């Protein structure tokens, strides 16, 4: 069993970004700039934003955090997004999710200028990504691809099973791994909550790669996978004891894996690294550097 160490991979990617940024700024260009909008005081969101800001500094970026109370009206939030969209000194914009229930999340995503949508959630970017065109790719799914690429895990012609069909992970990673991207050309099966248990087991037991993102601790058990499987655990679940675990019964499943991501220390770090890659791409686009 080998660990797909997201921390090690992310540090390597961010260091490479920092080298590129140093070259750009030494030539007289301004520093790349990322803006994050945070609504309310959701503890996990606070933690994620803190990580993004810290990593942006390591990448050589400037970052701005715009905080708003949970009571902000949707119209006010959309107006602020429009303001950031029109700011030529901001390359990338993140609106930290989730949002309060009175704000329509899709309205907010759609309001972000596609050229600043470094989360890769805007329909224009998602559509281009689906068609295999250049676009900002959804960060968690992109981070998974970069992790597999970093460790030279074979993907082409492999059978990959994705458990979970969210717009953030399941759908985009299915598309990326099946498309002819820099990493891809896998045969992908997308499963979800309505997939019959027997069918799910039939698929996972034949899979070369299993990616799970369902938010259920220990969902993937040892009897569900074959020896030598590559297992990507996207889950982040806090138990009553306070321990953070993934969607995989790590202790019992790991011994069957050729590669597996730890939780924490796996996909989470890669999500942030992918955001940095997208921010650099937005910056390069602004200066016609790409």
Swiss-Prot record:
Keyword Transmembrane helix included in the entry's annotation: no
Pfam families (UniProt xref): THF_DHG_CYH, THF_DHG_CYH_C
Record GO terms (molecular function): methenyltetrahydrofolate cyclohydrolase activity; methylenetetrahydrofolate dehydrogenase (NADP+) activity
Keywords assigned: Amino-acid biosynthesis, Histidine biosynthesis, Hydrolase, Methionine biosynthesis, Multifunctional enzyme, NADP, One-carbon metabolism, Oxidoreductase, Purine biosynthesis
One of the record's GO cellular component terms: cytosol
PROSITE patterns cross-referenced by the UniProt entry: THF_DHG_CYH_1
Binding positions (NADP(+)): 164-166, 193, 236
GO biological process assignments: L-histidine biosynthetic process; methionine biosynthetic process; purine nucleotide biosynthetic process; tetrahydrofolate interconversion
Catalysed conversion reaction: (6R)-5,10-methylene-5,6,7,8-tetrahydrofolate + NADP(+) = (6R)-5,10-methenyltetrahydrofolate + NADPH; (6R)-5,10-methenyltetrahydrofolate + H2O = (6R)-10-formyltetrahydrofolate + H(+)
EC number, as in UniProt: 1.5.1.5, 3.5.4.9
Pathway the protein acts in: One-carbon metabolism; tetrahydrofolate interconversion
PANTHER family cross-referenced by the UniProt entry: C-1-TETRAHYDROFOLATE SYNTHASE, CYTOPLASMIC, C-1-TETRAHYDROFOLATE SYNTHASE, CYTOPLASMIC-RELATED
Record's function text: Catalyzes the oxidation of 5,10-methylenetetrahydrofolate to 5,10-methenyltetrahydrofolate and then the hydrolysis of 5,10-methenyltetrahydrofolate to 10-formyltetrahydrofolate.
SUBUNIT field: Homodimer.
Protein family: Belongs to the tetrahydrofolate dehydrogenase/cyclohydrolase family.
Name of the protein described by the UniProt record: Bifunctional protein FolD 1
Organism: Geobacter sulfurreducens (strain ATCC 51573 / DSM 12127 / PCA)
Classification lineage: Bacteria, Pseudomonadati, Thermodesulfobacteriota, Desulfuromonadia, Geobacterales
